[in-house]
Amino acid sequence: MERVLIVNADDFGLSKGQNYGIIEACRNGVVTSTTALVNGAAIDHAAQLSRSTPELAVGMHFVLTLGEPLSAMPGLTREGRLGKWIWQQAEEGRLPLEEIAHELACQYRRFVDLFGHEPTHLDSHHHVHMIAPIYPIVAAFAREKGIALRIDRQVAAQSGLDQQAARSSAGFSSEFYGEAVSEELFLQTLDASIARGERSLEVMCHPAFVDQTIMGSAYCYPRLGELDVLTSAALKAAVADRGYRLGTYRDV
């Protein structure tokens, strides 16, 4: 049985080092897809690189926790900036859902302006689209646009979210992350998906070269480790041996 593996690199547009790492992992590794932060400091650079790398599918990384929003969001920003306090506001029932829906539409339009086409799919920075009150907004938007949505099945089940709300891969893994990234860890996520009988799987990753922006991230040097693993010839062979075809969200 053929299985589809989507290896999606998050944070396209975060920095030039991030962008170059994603392109390297696509051209010389197993990365097939990326998602772009349209308010990222290096988003124009990302769009330029994508034009010379048509084999890399590009989706949109919805941002509600970093930088400045594209629209006025007085209900979510502090001194005009977004931040991780969104979870506290969610717990307190103070999410400005109309502002969030409007910002999603603004970021989508910005993506199309930058890349010249619609995104292959939607996900989000720090998985904010899986916050229970935000999820139906993003899922309905994806359905309306006819594009796929990253759905973390485990979080959806725990939160009672509708897993059929939008088109998605059968499985999703965020486990290829942290100080201990390795070929073995990557392949364990595939083996677990096979054991669940899933026909398609997205594996999230963050390959990058380290630059000043990445140095300031809480998740820094492991991005280099991810890049090494994802560009391993042995890994690509092991993926094929498990019956996976490298693909994108266009394949699900």
Curated annotation (Swiss-Prot):
Main location, first listed in the record: cytoplasm
Q: Which cofactor does it need?
A: Mg(2+)
Gene3D superfamilies named among the record's database cross-references: Glycoside hydrolase/deacetylase (3.20.20.370)
Which residues are recorded as binding Mg(2+)?
A: H61, H125
Q: Could you name the Gene Ontology cellular component terms for this entry? A: cytoplasm
Q: Which family does it belong to?
A: Belongs to the YdjC deacetylase family. ChbG subfamily.
Q: Which reaction does it catalyse?
A: N,N'-diacetylchitobiose + H2O = N-acetyl-beta-D-glucosaminyl-(1->4)-D-glucosamine + acetate; diacetylchitobiose-6'-phosphate + H2O = N'-monoacetylchitobiose-6'-phosphate + acetate
Q: Which domain of life is it from?
A: Bacteria
**InterPro entries hit by this protein:** COD_ChbG_bac, Glyco_hydro/deAcase_b/a-brl, YdjC-like
Q: In which pathway does it act?
A: Glycan degradation; chitin degradation
Q: Which keywords does UniProt give here?
A: Carbohydrate metabolism, Chitin degradation, Cytoplasm, Hydrolase, Magnesium, Metal-binding, Polysaccharide degradation
Q: What does this protein do?
A: Involved in the degradation of chitin. ChbG is essential for growth on the acetylated chitooligosaccharides chitobiose and chitotriose but is dispensable for growth on cellobiose and chitosan dimer, the deacetylated form of chitobiose. Deacetylation of chitobiose-6-P and chitotriose-6-P is necessary for both the activation of the chb promoter by the regulatory protein ChbR and the hydrolysis of phosphorylated beta-glucosides by the phospho-beta-glucosidase ChbF.
Q: What is this protein called?
A: Chitooligosaccharide deacetylase
Which Pfam families has this protein been placed in?
YdjC (PF04794)
**What EC number(s) is this enzyme filed under?**
3.5.1.105
Quote the subunit structure annotation: Homodimer.
Lineage per the UniProt record: Bacteria, Pseudomonadati, Pseudomonadota, Gammaproteobacteria, Enterobacterales
Q: Which one of the record's GO molecular function terms can you name?
A: chitin disaccharide deacetylase activity
A Gene Ontology biological process in which this protein takes part is: chitin catabolic process
Its localization reads:
Cytoplasm
